[in-house]
Every structure is written in C-alpha cells, then in structure tokens.
C-alpha cells in the first residue's frame, strides 16, 4: 500500500518566495532519500499557499524517520526549519491512500 502525504502551509503575506527557498531544500532532501516529492503553489483559492506532497510506502517508517530527523537536527537544519516556521502562519497535513488501478 502506498500513501500520498500532502502538507499545506499558509505563508505570512508576502513571504511565499522566501519560504519556497526553504521548502525546495526540504523537498530536495526527500528526493535524495528516494521519496517522490512535489511542490505546488496556489493559482486560485487561498493566497500565499505552498503544498508539499510526498509519496510514501510505509506510514510507520515515515513517522519513525520524522522523529529521528527532528531529534538529530544540526544547527544549520534547525535554522532552516526555524526560517520556514517564521515565514508560515499555519499548516495542515492530509494523508491519502493511493489506489493503484
């Protein structure tokens, strides 16, 4: 079973370009780990929205890796995450099961 994990962030007004720089680095890291990753930005609807979608094979592995990542962050990574958090005002996560046909 595969899953699509869609994280959606609403950026502070005018901070989307700055936030996107950080999200591109995060997405590249996921891709380097072999995780299919896409980034989206709004065209219609709510403004200043960035979406990162990951395709994952195991929920257990994903959440285990997330806990390990946050527990072992170096100072540069902490700075990147702090920058992302500083440029966003809210976020949500939606998990989908991918249906193969």
Regions found by a protein language model. Name each.
Residues 21, 25-39, 55-92:
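An amphipathic, aromatic/His-enriched active-site/gating alpha helix that lines ligand/cofactor pockets
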Residues 89-101:
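Short, low-order "capping/linker" segments at domain edges
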Residues 10-21:
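Short, surface-exposed ligand-recognition loops at beta-strand->loop->(often short) alpha-helix junctions
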Residues 11-13, 56-58, 97-100:
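Non-catalytic surface loops within mature trypsin-like serine protease
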Residues 45-48:
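Short acidic/glycine-enriched loop/turn segments that link adjacent beta-strands
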Residues 4-9, 51:
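Active-site-flanking beta-strand signature of metal-NTP-handling nucleotidyl enzymes
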Residues 41-43:
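Short, low-complexity Ser/Thr-rich regulatory SLiMs
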């Amino acid at each position: 079973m595969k899953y699509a994990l869609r994280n959606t962030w609403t950026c502070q007004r005018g901070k989307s370009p700055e936030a996107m720089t950080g999200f591109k680095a995060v997405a590249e890291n996921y891709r380097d780990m072999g995780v299919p990753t896409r980034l989206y930005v709004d065209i219609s609807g709510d403004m200043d929205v960035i979406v990162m979608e990951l395709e994952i094979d195991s929920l257990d592995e994903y959440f285990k890796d997330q806990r390990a990542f946050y527990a072992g962050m170096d100072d540069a990574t902490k700075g990147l995450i702090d920058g992302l958090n500083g440029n966003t005002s809210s976020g949500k996560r939606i998990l989908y099961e991918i249906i193969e046909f």
